[in-house]
UniProtKB/Swiss-Prot annotation:
Residues 176-178, 343-344 are annotated as: Interaction with tRNA. Residues 119-121 are annotated as: Interaction with target base in tRNA. ATP binds at G33, M34, S35, G36, G37, V38, D39, S40, M59, G148. Disulfide bonds join C124-C226. Catalyzes the 2-thiolation of uridine at the wobble position (U34) of tRNA, leading to the formation of s(2)U34. It comes from Psychrobacter sp. (strain PRwf-1). The active site is at C124, C226. One of its GO terms (cellular component) is cytoplasm. The keyword RNA-binding applies. This is tRNA-specific 2-thiouridylase MnmA. GO terms for biological process: tRNA wobble position uridine thiolation. Belongs to the MnmA/TRMU family. PANTHER family: MITOCHONDRIAL TRNA-SPECIFIC 2-THIOURIDYLASE 1, TRNA 5-METHYLAMINOMETHYL-2-THIOURIDYLATE -METHYLTRANSFERASE. Pfam families: tRNA_Me_trans, tRNA_Me_trans_C, tRNA_Me_trans_M.
Length: 398
């Protein structure tokens, strides 16, 4: 990984790109990732209204069985086709299930086996939606791809080495901003992507869908991990990883129950632990404080802000900087002063980032205030103003 030169915060003052800023839309072909949801549907409408040559692509990323997931996928494809028919554009389909299994799902299982809590959506965006999809769209003659993500991007700029890139920016709707999930996508890929709904708030997106009588106008937003569907997470994971039950132990060493397997729990979790009333303990909620892999014990304690859940430092690795260049400031004695999120929708947290490797692919982060339930396997994502700098996988905390 290369390090940047002359880094300063002014480098992130480029304006957001609007559809009207793209020259010659009538000669510009855009392939939209059509998920069968309202956001991608409206993205296609907005691109069409702006005068682009628009086509759709439905991605099949998981080989479903004949159960609920299969029915949901078929419904999504039917809805995507109905929207494309309604607005008069072609819909292509592509099967990326093999790529998804190799690049995303196997990593997902390995992380759970190692006792961490991964976020497969981040890897899916990096490896599938902005790699496999982008590559496929290019074979269709696309100048850009587009998605229904609530995020924005800057105008393109050229790095010193000649690579054309763009900044990833927060979506205008703070409640829906998805830049956290896109932080691992390189700026060269962002430069080839349009985010039509990034400038809108969700109610406006639904209003546009209703105005155009789209079948997806009132469709419920999808939640959770795409390949799990409506199944219980525990039931799904048991199909692929053997459960290893063990003891539930209090923070002062008392065994008070049995857990079903450490992979089913995450730090800070309150519900679903299976602890009833405990003798000589107050009637207060119990929280997961630690997963002791060496002894296969789930450590629990009482108190939402238990000291074991609070930390002010973390180490992150596998850093993906959007610019594909680590900011020079992380190599300085002062470090990089910025904001961070250690989970989706967390309010910005002020911190300082220091390089922990020669190439900036590993960092130490010191927060101004203690953080609750920092979770290994999740991502720490960094921001300056509206711009998402990138992020990495949380390895440890203290």
């Amino acid at each position: 990984m290369t390090t940047s030169t002359g880094f300063d915060n002014n480098a992130y003052n480029l304006p957001a790109l609007r559809l009207s800023d793209v020259p010659n839309p009538a000669q510009t072909r855009v392939v939209v990732g059509m998920s069968g949801g309202v956001d991608s549907s409206v993205s296609a409408v907005l691109l069409q209204q702006a005068g682009f040559q628009v086509e759709g692509l439905f991605m099949k990323n998981w080989e479903e069985d004949d159960g609920t997931e299969y029915c949901t996928a078929m419904e999504d494809l039917a809805d995507a086709q109905a929207v494309c028919d309604k607005i008069g554009i072609n819909l292509h389909t592509a099967n990326f299930a093999m790529e998804y299994w190799d690049r995303v799902f196997e990593h997902f299982l390995a992380e759970y086996q190692a006792g961490r809590t991964p976020n497969p959506d981040i890897l899916c965006n990096k490896e599938i939606k902005f790699k496999a999809f982008l590559d496929y769209a290019v074979t269709l003659g696309a100048d850009y791809i587009a998605t229904g993500h609530y995020t924005r991007r800057s105008v393109n700029y050229t790095r010193e080495d000649g690579l054309e890139v763009a900044h990833l920016m927060r979506g205008l709707d703070n409640n829906k901003d998805q830049s956290y999930f896109l932080h691992a996508v390189g700026g060269d890929k962002i430069a080839k992507t349009l985010f039509p709904v990034g400038e809108l708030e969700k109610p406006e997106v639904r209003r546009i869908a209703e105005e155009h009588d789209l079948i997806t106008a009132k469709k419920k937003d999808s939640t959770g991990i795409c390949f799990i569907g409506e199944r219980r997470f525990k039931d799904f994971l048991q199909q692929y990883l053997p459960a290893k039950p063990g003891n539930i132990v209090t923070d002062d060493g008392i065994t008070i129950g049995k857990h079903d397997g450490l992979m089913y729990y995450t730090l800070g979790q309150r519900g679903g632990i299976g602890i009833g009333g405990v003798k000589d303990r107050p009637e207060e909620p119990w929280f997961v404080l630690q997963k002791d892999l060496s002894n296969n014990e789930l450590i629990v304690g009482q108190g939402h802000d238990h000291p074991m859940l609070l930390s002010q430092r973390l180490t992150a690795y596998k850093l993906d900087w959007v610019e594909r260049i680590a900011p020079a400031a992380i190599f300085s004695e002062q470090g990089l002063k910025c904001m961070a999120k250690t989970r989706y929708r967390q309010p910005d947290q002020s911190c300082t980032v220091f390089a922990d490797s020669d190439d900036g692919s590993r960092v130490k982060v010191i927060f101004d205030e203690p953080q609750r339930a920092v979770t290994p396997g999740q991502s720490a994502v960094f921001y300056i103003g509206e711009v998402c700098l990138g992020g990495g996988v949380i390895e440890s905390f203290e």
